[in-house]
From Swiss-Prot:
One of its GO terms (cellular component) is viral nucleocapsid. It comes from the Viruses. It comes from Borna disease virus 1 (BoDV-1). Pfam families: BDV_P40. Keywords: Capsid protein, Helical capsid protein, Host G2/M cell cycle arrest by virus, Host nucleus, Host-virus interaction, Modulation of host cell cycle by virus, Viral nucleoprotein, Viral penetration into host nucleus, Virion, Virus entry into host cell. The lineage of its organism: Viruses, Riboviria, Orthornavirae, Negarnaviricota, Haploviricotina. A motif (Nuclear export signal) lies at residues 128-141. The keyword Nucleus does not apply. Residues 1-25 are annotated as: Disordered. Changing I357V: In strain: Halle B1/91. Its main location: virion. This is Nucleoprotein. The gene is N. SUPFAM superfamilies: P40 nucleoprotein (SSF101399).
Length: 370
């Protein structure tokens, strides 16, 4: 019940009320806003000069030397040493030659905050040992796997799988013992470099170049491992739906809103495979704009059903943190649970389905309901 209005008995008070005027409106704002300074000075990594790559790399094998620079700088230098020509590509992409120092150095009246020279006066020009080269391989292997899958956190979670890939590569290079002993950089994690590279506008072009270049040995063996990881990386929705359509044995497939999106999914994926051919499995890794056509929002009901099924059937998906029911979906989890109780037939006669649903089910080998 609204509060009663208080009666004003005082004549002066009544007069004051009659004379009340609302405050004047605020003056119009000019529309200006705080601006970033031109050529912002946020600390950034660098790659040094091309002629110094090897000497910089030798110096940065030492942890005390690495600690002097931006945490991403050593990883970029190791990559430039690993792949000749990458330095020029990085420069073209806007990567600075100068790296910020972790702590500014004062020399007389001058304070140095960044430099393109990463080696010291005592750093000798020498060839790398085989174990040093393998250690750089190991670091860059983890780094590039993190780049193609788009996440440093997945590198931390899948450390054992990455070690297995590195051991496989070392065995292919006839240096199986290095799979265990190439540990000179094991305390230098590539996680910050992964996140930095993944934040660059050229990351997709970088990955595409790696995947489409014919490298000589040992680059071929190295990239073979990267390609295995890059295949269908960042395409979880696509791979989950494909597995669902091929292996699901319950009637969630026949829910009308799910079934109609199956037809759409098959059409879109077939068109993308035709357009991109051998590059189709790498659309996610190279950040191709067409990858969004296979995102959950394109097939929200089908994706919801696929994630629901996969979380029930696939132990590796049990910890998948994304919501089961995708934005834009009309199917409900209770509906999926109800349809899951009934099985479908594949290759054998079963209870007949309605005409349009039946035609869609035949596309994925479903012949009826049990």
């Amino acid at each position: 019940m609204p509060p009663k209005r208080r009666l004003v008995d005082d004549a002066d008070a009544m007069e004051d009320q009659d004379l009340y005027e609302p405050p004047a409106s605020l003056p119009k704002l000019p529309g200006k806003f705080l601006q970033y300074t031109v050529g912002g000075s946020d600390p950034h990594p660098g790659i040094g000069h091309e002629k110094d790559i090897r000497q910089n790399a030798v110096a940065l094998l030492d942890q005390s030397r690495r600690d002097m620079f931006h945490t991403v700088t050593p990883s970029l230098v190791f990559l430039c040493l690993l792949i000749p020509g990458l330095h020029a590509a990085f420069v073209h992409g806007g990567v600075p030659r100068e790296s910020y120092l972790s702590t500014p150095v004062t020399r007389g009246e001058q304070t140095v905050v960044k430099t393109a020279k990463f080696y010291g006066e005592k750093t000798t020009q020498r060839d790398l040992t085989e174990l040093e080269i393998s250690s750089i391989f190991s670091h860059c292997c983890s780094l590039l796997i993190g780049v193609v899958i788009g996440s440093s956190s997945k590198i931390k979670a899948g450390a054992e799988q990455i070690k297995k890939r590195f051991k496989t590569m070392m065995a292919a290079l006839n240096r199986p013992s290095h799979g265990e002993t190439a540990t000179l950089l094991q305390m230098f994690n590539p996680h910050e470099a992964i996140d930095w590279i993944n934040g660059q506008p050229w990351v997709g072009s970088f990955v595409l170049s790696l995947l489409t270049t014919d490298f000589e040995s040992p680059g071929k063996e190295f990239m073979d491992q990267i390609k295995l990881v890059a295949s269908y990386a960042q395409m979880t929705t696509y791979t989950t739906i494909k597995e669902y359509l091929a292996e699901c044995m319950d009637a969630t497939l026949t829910i009308p809103v799910v079934a109609y999106e199956i037809r759409d999914f098959l059409e879109v994926s077939a068109k993308l495979k035709e357009e991109h051919a051998d590059l189709f499995p790498f659309l996610g890794a190279i950040r191709h704009p067409d990858a969004i056509k296979l995102a959950p929002r394109s097939f929200p009901n089908l994706a919801s059903a696929a994630f629901y099924w996969s979380k029930k059937e696939n132990p590796t998906m049990a910890g998948y943190r994304a919501s089961t029911i995708q934005p834009g979906a009309s199917v409900k989890e209770t509906q999926l649970a109800r349809y899951r109780r009934r099985e479908i037939s594949r290759g054998e006669d079963g209870a007949e389905l309605s005409g349009e649903i039946s035609a869609i089910m035949r596309m994925i080998g479903v012949t009826g309901l049990n």
